[in-house]
């Protein structure tokens, strides 16, 4: 009986130690996040470069989907929410449609989506960068314009993904200065 109690106690202590290590890892990853951000943005840009030409050639529209009002939201007090909503918009609405353009495109868009998900996880883990609740009107305008473009919306949104990366960079630069 004593040996089973001792075993349970040792398992408990091991669990406590492991959870402490995870907490330290999470804190360390947040400490190093500002220095790893340029690398993450570089990876996003590299992944996008594999599909950029395809989607920009298909985008025959002159108007911009991602405009200055969205950038202003990214730089202002709604930056957190705008970033969060735009990541969700690309992951849930744009990229699933973008994947429907052949196996090569699907593979590259999927890779791009995974990198964007990784960024989102890191941002959420470090509450300093994504502590938000309010809605962004600029994001709602982007979503509305995207819907109105119907099948052309995916070309427009994907062709402007590099602008989105630039907006992420602008938001993160602002947050790191604060």
Swiss-Prot record:
Quick one: a GO biological-process term for this protein? positive regulation of DNA-binding transcription factor activity
| Matching InterPro entries | 4_helix_cytokine-like_core, IL-10, IL-10/19/20/24/26, IL-10_CS
Glycosylation site positions: 67, 134
What GO MF annotations does this protein's record show?
A: cytokine activity
Query: Which PROSITE patterns does the entry mention?
Result: INTERLEUKIN_10
| Compartment list | Secreted
- Print the keywords alphabetically: Cytokine, Disulfide bond, Glycoprotein, Secreted, Signal
Gene Ontology CC annotations of this record: extracellular space
Q: Does the keyword Cell inner membrane apply?
A: no
Q: Does the keyword Signal apply?
A: yes
Subunit structure and binding partners: Homodimer. Interacts with IL10RA and IL10RB.
What is the recorded name of this protein? Answer: Interleukin-10
Q: Which organism is it from?
A: Equus caballus
Ranked from the top, the taxonomy reads: Eukaryota, Metazoa, Chordata, Craniata, Vertebrata
